[in-house]
Amino acid sequence: MTETLTVLYEDDDVAAVSKPPGVVAHPVGSKSAGVTMADLIAKRWPAVAGVGPAERHGLVHRLDKDTSGVVLVAKTARAFEALTAQFAERQVEKRYTALVEGVPAVPRGRIDAPVGRHYAKGERMTVHPDGRHAETKYEIVETVGDAGRGGAAYALLDVWPSTGRTHQIRVHLAALGHPVAGDTAYGATERPVGLGRQFLHAAEIKFVHPVTGKQIRVKDPLPADLAAFLKELR
């Protein structure tokens, strides 16, 4: 187990950690996932092994394998119950940083489109009328890269999903016509040289502390691989 956890916030009840890219949240079914976030959490805090479902070790929510960023860990059963309720009631605010192909015509917008399982490709999600309600807000932070004729090749976005459907941000941005850079599963034309994964990072989370009732805000800076790629484009 070579990966280690970067702890962004910690007290007796809850912790916020930085999920590295390439690591899945926890084992799913009988598939071997290698080292998971649940493994790393159990190694760092052995006492949380009994918090929440057995395979999650206190992990309150998940990020896609190749998405990096902040995730919450409940260190007690009381905290796990309270935090999962906040997610279910959409009281947790999450902000992502995404680099997308091209530049959206509307600099600040909202995508309201149902998301469900792809009929032909079961491991992927898609927008379709039989899906579950999903809503994502975005705002252009800057445009970078050269697409020729004075146009920008990419747009850097702040993204706020108000619902938490599987692959929601990736699906919604692809449906907008601006897939996440490097996300070939959802429409990116190709993975650019220097970008080893999809450019999507969970940059910030705000939640109410399950015991004190105070609002907690935790930020996770852009990791080195994405920061280096962005620097090359600027």
Write out the residue ranges for each language-model feature.
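RNA pseudouridine synthases
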Residues: M1-R234
